[in-house]
A protein has these predicted regions:
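Compact, glycine-rich, soluble single-domain proteins
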Residues: 1-66
Length: 66
């Protein structure tokens, strides 16, 4: 995810193996869904998706392309 804090972006693609994609889908990260970056601390993110705040480490966040 490359965007600024407070900016709403749309998920274009999710990369990784099937297990990673399934995990992210279960959290609500689906292609076409809008997300907002709430906080970025050294690449570790807190994002708002569907009204929920989710923490992602740098490696997991890198799998979500916007």
């Amino acid at each position: 995810i490359l965007s600024k804090v407070g900016e709403e972006v749309t998920i274009k693609k999710i990369t990784g193996n099937a297990e990673t994609k399934k995990f992210l889908n279960s959290l609500g990260f689906i292609i076409g869904e809008g997300i907002t970056i709430v906080s970025d601390l050294g690449g570790n993110l807190i994002v708002n998706i569907k009204g929920a705040r989710i923490a992602l480490d740098k490696s997991m966040a890198s799998r979500i392309l916007v």
